[in-house]
């Protein structure tokens, strides 16, 4: 998004104007050669723009091509995210890249429209990320209600609200000049952003060669709240809750696996070998934690520095030579530019984070014409869905075990349409761990107890009914 006035200094504008005048005075047919730093900058920014375009186009094409992907409501939000990131790569990045390499804004009065596109596309991308987190939390915490309520119409309404809000806080304030700092705007006649008067002949050139506007404090704070701070707070809450629910489900699956293996070892009367299912469940919890941490970490690292400066810079002092500076110190132009591009770079990473699962990889391979060569190495990823949370390769196995074990116990009905509460997350596992105690190697007493436990005949009629959470609260 747009840096609000940077240092409120005329120096970058004067340097850019001098470069323009030098180019006008240069002989016809000659052009100022780019320096090494400009060439490197142009190359890196071009790669970033091309990668962002290709990644998001591939995501949209995969969903349009695959009926299976179109059937999932979540992918409506993925398409909306990809479209907003495509707009960032088409309507925002190229113009700024040219200005970075040239050293000034060469597109004249297109500046105001570009500013509106910048705010709209960046806000839409962030709001779509927030909607995806809410959608996943709703799907996992209340899966049956989610299946009933999350229709295509509801999904489109949510997407429409995100885009409407993005347009409202971008085009309307920018076109009506509500976003500018009245005291320090470059649009003020004869004045620079720091109040320094322009020479009469340089006024028009100075306004058009530098596209950075001075945001007023009200707009900078309110737009930052809507575009970033409120969405990031929602994302932190939802992904924290998703992780806690994932913990519950993974441990529940691990307990069912141990119980099923215990029953099988009793029937075969073979030597029992403790299964490392507990270690596997810990690994899966770690995998879920890493996945969610990556989602939040990339988003926060890309956008947080910019939005901190976005709220801080309007309070910067103009720093006149005759008086001392007051307020926050202003940041350099280079620092602000780096953080702006960091935020836009998030649009190039979103396709990797949100669309690089097994279903998308298969369609990607078909679109790229390399079904036999692309993505042949199996990659274990975590499914964050309304089904059991597990590795892709183990999902069917876990469901079979869960179904078989539930059928073994009468009245064992789990609450599928109720949110997992905090009271469920700690207590139940102590009871479940008693179903399949592990035997330490070399402990004769423990092995004897285990053999007696296997030899004892269990009557299903004697099993007392369980609570709705599959756990008996009585001794």
Swiss-Prot record:
The coding gene here is Drd5
Q: Which domain of life is it from?
A: Eukaryota
What spans does the record annotate as topological domain Cytoplasmic, numbered to this chain? 65-75, 135-153, 241-289, 358-475
Q: Where is the lipid attached (S-palmitoyl cysteine)?
A: 370
PANTHER family tied to this protein: ADRENERGIC RECEPTOR-RELATED G-PROTEIN COUPLED RECEPTOR, D(1B) DOPAMINE RECEPTOR
Q: Where in the cell is it found?
A: Cell membrane
Q: In which tissues is it expressed?
A: Brain, in the lateral mammillary nuclei, the anterior pretectal nuclei, and several layers of the hippocampus.
Q: List all disulphide bridges recorded for this chain.
A: 111-211
Q: A Pfam family matched by this chain, by name?
A: 7tm_1
Report the protein name in the record: D(1B) dopamine receptor
Sorted UniProt keywords: Cell membrane, Disulfide bond, G-protein coupled receptor, Glycoprotein, Lipoprotein, Membrane, Palmitate, Receptor, Transducer, Transmembrane, Transmembrane helix
Q: Which GO terms describe its biological process?
A: adenylate cyclase-activating adrenergic receptor signaling pathway; adenylate cyclase-activating dopamine receptor signaling pathway; adenylate cyclase-activating G protein-coupled receptor signaling pathway; associative learning; cellular response to catecholamine stimulus; G protein-coupled dopamine receptor signaling pathway; long-term synaptic depression; mating behavior
Chief location of this protein within or outside the cell: membrane
Its membrane topology is listed as: Multi-pass membrane protein
User: According to its UniProt entry, what is the function of this protein?
Assistant: Dopamine receptor whose activity is mediated by G proteins which activate adenylyl cyclase.
Q: An example Gene Ontology cellular component term from the record?
A: glutamatergic synapse
């Amino acid at each position: 998004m747009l840096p609000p006035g940077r240092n409120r200094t005329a120096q970058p504008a004067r340097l850019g104007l001098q470069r323009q005048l030098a180019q006008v005075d240069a002989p016809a047919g000659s052009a100022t050669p780019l320096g090494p730093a400009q060439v490197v900058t142009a190359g890196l920014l071009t790669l970033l723009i091309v990668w962002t375009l290709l990644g998001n186009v591939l995501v949209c094409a995969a969903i349009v091509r695959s009926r299976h992907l179109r059937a999932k409501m979540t992918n409506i939000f993925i398409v909306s995210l990809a479209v907003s990131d495509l707009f960032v790569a088409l309507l925002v990045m190229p113009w700024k890249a040219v200005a970075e390499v040239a050293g000034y804004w060469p597109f004249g009065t297109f500046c105001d429209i570009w500013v509106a596109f910048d705010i709209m596309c960046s806000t839409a991308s962030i709001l779509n990320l927030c909607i995806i987190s809410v959608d996943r939390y709703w799907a996992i915490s209340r899966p049956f209600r989610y299946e009933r309520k999350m229709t295509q119409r509801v999904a489109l309404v949510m997407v429409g609200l995100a885009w409407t809000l993005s347009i409202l806080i971008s085009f309307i304030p920018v076109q009506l000049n509500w976003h500018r700092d009245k005291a320090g705007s470059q649009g003020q006649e004869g004045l620079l952003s720091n109040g320094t008067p322009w020479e009469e002949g340089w006024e028009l050139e100075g306004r058009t060669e530098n596209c950075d506007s001075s945001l007023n404090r009200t707009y900078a704070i309110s737009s930052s709240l809507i575009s970033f701070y409120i969405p990031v707070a929602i994302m932190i809450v939802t992904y924290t809750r998703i992780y806690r629910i994932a913990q519950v489900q993974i441990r529940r699956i691990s307990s069912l696996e141990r119980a099923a293996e215990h029953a099988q070892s009793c029937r075969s009367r073979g030597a029992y070998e403790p299964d490392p299912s507990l270690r596997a469940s810990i690994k899966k919890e770690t995998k879920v934690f890493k996945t969610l941490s990556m989602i939040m970490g990339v988003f926060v690292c890309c956008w947080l520095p910019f939005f901190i400066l976005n709220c801080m810079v309007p309070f910067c002092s103009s720093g006149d030579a005759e008086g001392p500076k007051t307020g926050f110190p202003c940041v350099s132009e280079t620092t602000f530019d780096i953080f702006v591009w960091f935020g836009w770079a998030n649009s190039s990473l979103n396709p990797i984070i949100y669309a690089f699962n097994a279903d998308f990889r298969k369609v990607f391979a078909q679109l790229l014409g390399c079904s036999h060569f692309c993505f042949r190495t199996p990659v274990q990823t975590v499914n964050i869905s309304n089904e059991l949370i597990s590795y892709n390769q183990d999902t069917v196995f876990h469901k079979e075990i869960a179904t078989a074990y539930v059928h073994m116990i009468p009245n064992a009905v789990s609450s599928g349409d109720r949110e997992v509460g905090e009271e469920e997350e700690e207590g139940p596992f102590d009871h479940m761990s008693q179903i399949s105690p592990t035997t330490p190697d070399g402990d004769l007493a423990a092995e004897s107890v285990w053999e007696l436990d296997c030899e004892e005949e269990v009557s299903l009629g004697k099993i007392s009914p369980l609570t709705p959470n599959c756990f008996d609260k009585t001794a």
